[in-house]
């Protein structure tokens, strides 16, 4: 009797472990959709950057996938970007361009939310900040109105990147209502970074 009870207990525990370890994916997305979403995110950055060079992504990952309906979803991506040797006017595919080399070439960390329908990109929101490991922590980049510029003379450009956050702090896209309350200009934005004026990000 005791052996039977012990056997039932073992089966119960193993069964509980099985159900807690297995899970249901939020959405069984096609890898091609991920590639399309990443390409659209990089294209959004390059379309709003004032750098003379194109940016290219690397170290990308999917953070979340939400199914909106049978044919629509949103993807939250995180990736890093760096300037390439291709100039903007070349209209080249950034994925085919070589990265610029050198210790002082900065790296930016970006998060994007991409809405897709019928495997086609509908909307893209991207927000980036300079990586603390890239050596781009100058005070000029902490002011509102700085836009993603070139690594050699980016202070001559308006940089659209927010000041760097701590690695463990999440990065969120402000809502439209928040941006209405804090219009473009020299007004300070209430945030955890002292003396920093924050850009609402790429949109």
From Swiss-Prot:
Residues 1-23 form the signal peptide. It comes from the Eukaryota. Multiply phosphorylated at serine residues in Ser-X-Glu/Ser(P) sequences, a recognition motif for phosphorylation by secretory pathway protein kinase. The keyword Transport does not apply. SUPFAM superfamilies: Cystatin/monellin. Transmembrane segments: none annotated. In liver and bone but not in heart, lung, kidney, or spleen. Keywords: Disulfide bond, Phosphoprotein, Secreted, Signal. It is found in: Secreted. The modification Phosphoserine is found at residues 90, 138-139, 166, 175. GO terms for biological process: bone remodeling. The keyword Signal applies. Its main location: secreted. InterPro entries: Cystatin_sf, Spp-24. GO terms for cellular component: extracellular region. Disulfide bonds join 86-97, 110-128. Could coordinate an aspect of bone turnover. Belongs to the SPP2 family. This is Secreted phosphoprotein 24. It comes from Bos taurus.
């Amino acid at each position: 009797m005791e052996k039977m009870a012990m056997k039932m207990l073992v089966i119960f525990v193993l069964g509980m472990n099985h159900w807690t370890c297995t899970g249901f994916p939020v959405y069984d997305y096609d890898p091609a959709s991920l590639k399309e979403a990443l390409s659209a995110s990089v294209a959004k950055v390059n379309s709003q950057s004032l750098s003379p060079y194109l940016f290219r992504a690397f170290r990308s990952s999917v953070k979340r996938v939400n199914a909106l309906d049978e044919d629509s979803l949103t993807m939250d991506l995180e990736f890093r970007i760096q300037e390439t040797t291709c100039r903007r006017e070349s209209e080249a595919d950034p994925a085919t361009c070589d990265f610029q080399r050198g210790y002082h070439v900065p790296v930016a960390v970006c998060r994007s939310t991409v809405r897709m329908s019928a495997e086609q990109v509908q909307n893209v929101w991207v927000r980036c900040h300079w990586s603390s490991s890239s050596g781009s922590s100058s005070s000029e980049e902490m002011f509102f109105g700085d836009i993603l510029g070139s690594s050699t003379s980016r202070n001559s450009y308006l940089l659209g990147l927010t000041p760097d956050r701590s690695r463990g702090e999440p990065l969120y896209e402000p809502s439209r209502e928040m941006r209405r309350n804090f219009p473009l200009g020299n007004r300070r934005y209430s945030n955890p970074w002292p003396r920093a004026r924050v850009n609402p990000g790429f949109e």
